[in-house]
Amino acid sequence: AKKTLKNFKKGNNFYYWYRVKKEAQIIAKQRNKKESLNYIVAEFDKIEKPNNKILFDIANFYKNSKKYEKAIKYYTAIIDSIDKNSEIKPDLLYRRGGSYERIGLYKKADKDLLYALKISPDDAYVLNYLAYSWLERNYKINEAITMLETAYSLKSNDPYIIDSIGWAYYLTDDYLKAEKFLKSAVELMPDDPIVND
């Protein structure tokens, strides 16, 4: 596989970047994520005019490596460059909002996530993420529960959404409902430490 990847030269940004991404993934699997990130960043810096696809990839690599400020920088660059009605905007807002939330910039996080929901009100994952963030902050609990109930109606077999709604009921002392949902979450994903905490 590596020999094939080497054939993608730097002259063609698309194929060059495809090779770089694949090699970074191989490094992450065979060695470690830090080395993988260092490699892809070094290669990214060699590209004079990265397009939005490349910016999106590097932002995701930073986000997955918990380098949230860097991720925000590149998500913002894409958001600023695309049409306001672009179909990819809600996903970018979700990713940037999640990055803001991770570093405690909750006002900016809420703004992005609510904007994403304004564009795509039936996105179960954005509903779940924002609602869970509010639960953790003890903020707008009733609204958070309503959002989670909507998310559950859209994705009734998702263990993370089921776990979130169970946690919401637990926080509001509705222990019977909480037990039902939390048990269901564990059954759907018994080996996940997040669900089993």
Map each language-model feature to its residues.
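Single-residue signature of alpha-solenoid repeat helices
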Residues: 4, 36-37, 71, 109, ...
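Hydrophobic/aromatic packing residues within the alpha-helices of TPR/SEL1-like helical repeat arrays
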Residues: 5-8, 40-41, 68, 75, ...
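Structural marker of alpha-solenoid helical repeat scaffolds
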Residues: 10-13, 46-47, 81-85, 119, ...
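Alpha-solenoid helical repeat scaffolds
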Residues: 17-23, 53-57, 87-95, 125-129, ...
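Residue-level recognition of tetratricopeptide repeat
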Residues: 25-26, 60, 98, 132-133, ...
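Register position in tetratricopeptide repeats
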Residues: 29-30, 64, 95-98, 102, ...
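Short coil/turn linking the two alpha-helices of tandem helical-hairpin repeats
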Residues: 31, 83-87, 135-139, 173
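TPR-repeat structural position
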Residues: 33-34, 68, 106, 141, ...
